[in-house]
C-alpha cells in the first residue's frame, strides 16, 4: 500500500514508541525526515539520530530521550499541514506553541526550522507539525 503522508507516519511512530517508553525506533529515511529528526535532536526532544544505508532509501534510527525518573521529554506531537489541507504561515504569522514551551516545525525555502528561527530570519513557510 502506498503511504500518503510519510511525515505523519514518522511522527506517529515517534509518538507510539514514546508512549511505551522504547529506547529507539526506525523509520524509512527521506531528506525532510532527516531534517526533522536533526531539528528534534538540536532542540533536545530526542537523544540521537543515525542514518543507516540499506541499498534502498535508507533507514533513520531515532533514539528517544527520557528524564531522570523515566518521564517523557516529548509530551505531544501533532501534524498540522497535511496532504489534503496544507497550512502556510507568513513571516509575521508563524505560530507559537504553548507560549514558547513547544516548537512549531516550519518548512521554508531555507530548509526545515523551528518557529523561533523562522521569526528571526523573517521567513514564512509550511507549518509541518507542533512538538511540545
Curated annotation (Swiss-Prot):
GO terms for cellular component: ribonucleoprotein complex; ribosome. One of its GO terms (molecular function) is rRNA binding. One of the primary rRNA binding proteins, it binds directly to 16S rRNA central domain where it helps coordinate assembly of the platform of the 30S subunit. This is Small ribosomal subunit protein uS8. Keywords: Ribonucleoprotein, Ribosomal protein, RNA-binding, rRNA-binding. The keyword Phosphoprotein does not apply. HAMAP family: Ribosomal_uS8_B. It comes from Bacillus anthracis. Part of the 30S ribosomal subunit. Contacts proteins S5 and S12. Belongs to the universal ribosomal protein uS8 family. Pfam families: Ribosomal_S8 (PF00410). InterPro entries: Ribosomal_uS8, Ribosomal_uS8_CS, Ribosomal_uS8_sf. It comes from the Bacteria. One of its GO terms (biological process) is translation.
Amino acid at each position: 500500500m502506498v503511504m500518503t503522508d510519510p511525515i505523519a507516519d514518522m511522527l506517529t511512530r515517534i509518538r507510539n514508541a514514546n508512549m511505551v517508553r522504547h529506547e529507539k525506533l526506525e523509520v524509512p529515511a527521506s531528506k525532510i525526515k532527516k531534517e526533522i529528526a536533526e531539528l528534534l535532536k538540536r532542540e533536545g526532544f530526542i537523544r540521537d539520530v543515525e542514518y543507516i544505508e540499506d541499498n534502498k532509501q535508507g533507514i533513520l534510527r531515532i533514539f528517544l530521550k527520557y528524564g531522570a525518573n523515566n518521564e517523557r521529554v516529548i509530551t505531544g506531537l501533532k501534524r498540522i499541514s497535511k496532504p489534503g489541507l496544507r497550512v502556510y504561515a507568513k513571516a509575521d504569522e508563524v505560530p507559537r506553541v504553548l507560549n514558547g514551551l513547544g516548537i512549531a516545525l516550519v518548512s521554508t525555502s531555507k530548509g526545515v526550522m523551528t518557529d523561533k528561527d523562522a521569526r528571526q530570519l523573517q521567513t514564512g513557510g509550511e507549518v509541518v507539525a507542533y512538538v511540545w
